[in-house]
């Protein structure tokens, strides 16, 4: 698989992840804690794919790395909030599946940043 195919497939996965996360958050029972969790997780979870997409229009190699780094930070934050969701709502099976998928995004972003930095030298 070439870089463009990999990027397209990863972005498609991120779009599906964001849609699934949105559906999950809307299905949670109402509570004050849910509102905070829903807000934080919704923001960070959707930001991963948005920043990854934006990296495709980077103006330089350094800008590309910067945008991927932002996506990684958001993926790490999403990991935290998904962990909270799994603890607060262990009955929600979809949360664990999304947690695993997000962890894959963390690994992809870490490797992409590492490769881009190596190619920058």
PLM region spans:
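Amphipathic alpha-helical assembly/interaction segments
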Residues: 1-121
């Amino acid at each position: 698989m070439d870089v463009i195919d990999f990027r397209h497939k990863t972005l498609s996965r991120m779009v599906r992840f964001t849609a699934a996360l949105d559906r999950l958050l809307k299905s949670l029972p109402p509570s004050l804690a849910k509102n905070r969790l829903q807000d934080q997780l919704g923001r960070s979870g959707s930001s991963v794919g948005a920043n990854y997409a934006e990296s495709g229009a980077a103006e330089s190699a350094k800008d590309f790395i910067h945008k991927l780094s932002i996506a990684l930070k958001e993926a790490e934050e999403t990991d935290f909030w998904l962990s909270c969701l799994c603890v607060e709502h262990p009955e929600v099976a979809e949360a664990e599946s999304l947690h695993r998928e997000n962890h894959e995004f963390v690994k992809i972003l870490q490797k992409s940043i590492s490769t881009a930095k190596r190619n920058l030298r």
